[in-house]
Amino acid sequence: MNPTARYVIEAVYPAAALLLPPAMNTPAAWRMLTAIGLQESRFRHRAQVLGPARGFWQFERGGGVVAVLRHEASRDAARDVLTRLCYADTSPQKIHAALEHNDVLAACFARLLLWTAARPLPTAPSAGGEPYLATWRPG
């Protein structure tokens, strides 16, 4: 296993789980986020190579960051996470920049973005592409 993926699974996810509502802390969610992180950055790049995305889950400021901050399903939990992590400036610009340097914040935002999909997470690995495509919109 990629040593950074091990770090994310063993250290980042447990810390993120403590900051998020209990309903978001499911094995299916963490598996899905692991697959997304491996797809987006291979857990090697916190800043997109030749691009604007930040964090292992490759958030863009005007896309995923704004979506998490504004979506009805995620905004209150996002504010709570930011408060608990002592981020006073919650502008999309500042949060976007912070995702590159705070893996727990990035994991929380990735879980919150996945939460906005408003569909249950698939139980079959072969169905995992749908929520990824719906929320990350890669390409």
Features from the language model and the residues they span:
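Peptidoglycan-targeting cell-wall enzymes and recognition modules
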Residues: N2-A11, L38-A118
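Catalytic phosphate/metal-binding cores of nucleic-acid and nucleotide-processing enzymes, i.e., regions
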Residues: P3-V12, A16-P27, A35-L38
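Amphipathic alpha-helical interaction segments
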Residues: R31-A35, C108, P131
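Structured segments of extracytoplasmic/periplasmic soluble domains
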Residues: A15, L19, Q39, L113-A117, ...
